[in-house]
């Protein structure tokens, strides 16, 4: 999990004036697990439904939070499965050629804005 994930949900929880116990009860999770998430000490990333619950209750962007947690949203996961043979080559090329990576990411951002 990204270190930013824990900091983000902790700060958002405090901004909403929730205690860990209150938010955990809303999410139907143990407050000790929420504490581990906030401190980046959880043994595994939370499930997508928990992340979406955090986002809804803390007024955070669901997709961003899913990525920060180290997960891939279900719809993107399906796309990756459909094109699984192309992914290693794409990621390798992006790693080896930062300009190409920037171009791909910029084009993706421009497409989302339209």
Which residues are covered by each model-predicted region?
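Short, basic-rich loop-to-helix N-cap that marks the start of a DNA-contacting helix
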Residues: 17, 25, 41-56
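Intrinsically disordered, low-complexity basic tails/linkers immediately adjacent to helix-turn-helix/homeobox/MYB/SANT
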Residues: 56-62, 93-95
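Interfacial/linker helices and their anchor residues that mediate assembly or domain coupling
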Residues: 70-114
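DNA-binding alpha-helical recognition surfaces that contact promoter or target DNA
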Residues: 7, 11, 25, 36, ...
């Amino acid at each position: 999990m990204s270190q930013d994930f824990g900091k983000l949900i902790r700060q958002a929880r405090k901004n909403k004036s929730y205690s860990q116990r209150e938010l955990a009860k809303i999410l139907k999770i143990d407050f000790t697990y929420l504490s581990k998430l906030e401190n980046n000490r959880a043994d595994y990333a939370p499930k997508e439904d928990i992340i979406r619950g955090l986002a809804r209750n803390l007024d955070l962007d669901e997709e961003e939070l899913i990525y920060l947690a180290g997960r891939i949203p279900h719809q993107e996961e399906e796309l990756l499965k459909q094109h699984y043979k192309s992914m290693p080559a794409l990621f390798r090329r992006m790693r080896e050629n930062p300009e190409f990576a920037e171009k791909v990411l910029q084009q993706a951002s421009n497409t989302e804005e339209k």
